[in-house]
C-alpha cells in the first residue's frame, strides 16, 4: 500500500484547471489502487503564513526563546514535514501565475525547506533528506510556455524537489487554457491522458 499526498495551490477553487485535474487523478488513483491512502491538502483554502523576519527565526536552530507566533510556525513546519515524509507519492497541482508558482505553494515550500531536517549541507554540497518519494506535478497555464524561457515553473519545481531529495518527478501540462474553449478542452483531454498513463504505470 502506498500513501499519496495531494497539494492543491490554486486560488480559483472549483474553477481551477489544476484542481480539476488533481481531482481527476485522485479518482483514477482510487480506481486503480483502491488500497492506497490519499491525503489532500488545499493550500489556498488553508493558507500557510508568509515567511518573514520573525518566522524565519523559528526555523533555524537557536537557544533563544520563541514568540507565540514563532511557536505556531515551527509546529506547522514540523507538521508539514512529517506529513511529507509519511507519504510515498507527492502530487502537486501547480498553476502558473505570472510565469511562476502561486504564492500559496511558495509559502508551503518556505516552511518545508529546513536545514538539518529536509536537507543538509555536507563537504560535497547540499544533500536532500526527503528520499524514496515520487512526485507528480500537474501544471496548468493560460498560455503556451512548455520548454520555453517563460516557463519558470518546471525548472523551479525540479530544482526545489531535487534539493530536498525528490528526484523522481513527472510533469503533466495543461496549456493554452486562455486561448478559447476548444483549446482549453484539448488541454484538459491531453492532461487527463497523461495522468491515465502515470496512474496505470
Curated annotation (Swiss-Prot):
<dbReference type="GO" id="GO:0009055">
    <property type="term" value="F:electron transfer activity"/>
</dbReference>
<dbReference type="GO" id="GO:0010181">
    <property type="term" value="F:FMN binding"/>
</dbReference>
<feature type="binding site">
    <location>
        <begin position="140"/>
        <end position="143"/>
    </location>
    <ligand>
        <name>FMN</name>
    </ligand>
</feature>
<keyword id="KW-0560">Oxidoreductase</keyword>
<dbReference type="Pfam" id="PF02525">
    <property type="entry name" value="Flavodoxin_2"/>
</dbReference>
<comment type="function">
    <text>Quinone reductase that provides resistance to thiol-specific stress caused by electrophilic quinones.</text>
</comment>
<comment type="subunit">
    <text>Homodimer.</text>
</comment>
<comment type="function">
    <text>Also exhibits azoreductase activity. Catalyzes the reductive cleavage of the azo bond in aromatic azo compounds to the corresponding amines.</text>
</comment>
<dbReference type="InterPro" id="IPR023048">
    <property type="entry name" value="NADH:quinone_OxRdtase_FMN_depd"/>
</dbReference>
<dbReference type="InterPro" id="IPR003680">
    <property type="entry name" value="Flavodoxin_fold"/>
</dbReference>
<dbReference type="GO" id="GO:0016652">
    <property type="term" value="F:oxidoreductase activity, acting on NAD(P)H as acceptor"/>
</dbReference>
<keyword id="KW-0288">FMN</keyword>
<keyword id="KW-0285">Flavoprotein</keyword>
<feature type="binding site">
    <location>
        <begin position="16"/>
        <end position="18"/>
    </location>
    <ligand>
        <name>FMN</name>
    </ligand>
</feature>
<dbReference type="GO" id="GO:0016655">
    <property type="term" value="F:oxidoreductase activity, acting on NAD(P)H, quinone or similar compound as acceptor"/>
</dbReference>
<feature type="binding site">
    <location>
        <position position="10"/>
    </location>
    <ligand>
        <name>FMN</name>
    </ligand>
</feature>
<comment type="similarity">
    <text>Belongs to the azoreductase type 1 family.</text>
</comment>
<keyword id="KW-0520">NAD</keyword>
<dbReference type="InterPro" id="IPR050104">
    <property type="entry name" value="FMN-dep_NADH:Q_OxRdtase_AzoR1"/>
</dbReference>
<feature type="binding site">
    <location>
        <begin position="96"/>
        <end position="99"/>
    </location>
    <ligand>
        <name>FMN</name>
    </ligand>
</feature>
<dbReference type="InterPro" id="IPR029039">
    <property type="entry name" value="Flavoprotein-like_sf"/>
</dbReference>
<protein>
    <recommendedName>
        <fullName>FMN-dependent NADH:quinone oxidoreductase</fullName>
        <ecNumber>1.6.5.-</ecNumber>
        <ecNumber>1.7.1.17</ecNumber>
    </recommendedName>
</protein>
Amino acid at each position: 500500500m502506498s500513501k499519496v499526498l495531494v497539494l492543491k495551490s490554486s486560488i480559483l477553487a472549483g474553477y481551477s484547471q489544476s484542481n480539476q485535474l488533481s481531482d481527476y487523478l485522485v479518482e483514477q488513483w482510487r480506481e486503480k489502487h483502491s488500497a492506497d491512502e490519499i491525503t489532500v491538502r488545499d493550500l489556498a483554502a488553508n493558507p500557510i503564513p508568509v515567511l518573514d523576519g520573525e518566522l524565519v527565526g523559528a526555523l533555524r536552530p537557536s537557544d533563544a526563546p520563541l514568540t507565540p507566533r514563532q511557536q505556531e510556525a515551527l509546529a506547522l513546519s514540523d507538521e508539514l514535514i512529517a506529513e511529507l515524509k509519511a507519504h510515498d507519492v507527492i502530487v502537486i497541482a501547480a498553476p502558473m501565475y505570472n510565469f511562476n508558482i502561486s504564492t500559496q505553494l511558495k509559502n508551503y515550500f518556505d516552511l518545508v525547506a529546513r536545514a538539518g531536517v529536509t536537507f543538509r549541507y555536507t563537504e560535497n554540497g547540499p544533500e536532500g533528506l526527503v528520499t524514496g518519494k515520487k512526485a507528480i506535478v500537474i501544471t496548468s497555464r493560460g498560455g503556451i510556455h512548455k520548454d520555453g524561457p517563460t516557463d519558470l515553473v518546471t525548472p523551479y519545481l525540479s530544482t526545489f524537489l531535487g534539493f530536498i531529495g525528490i528526484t523522481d518527478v513527472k510533469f503533466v501540462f495543461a496549456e493554452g487554457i486562455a486561448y478559447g474553449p476548444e483549446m482549453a478542452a484539448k488541454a484538459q483531454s491531453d492532461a487527463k491522458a497523461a495522468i491515465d498513463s502515470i496512474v496505470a504505470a
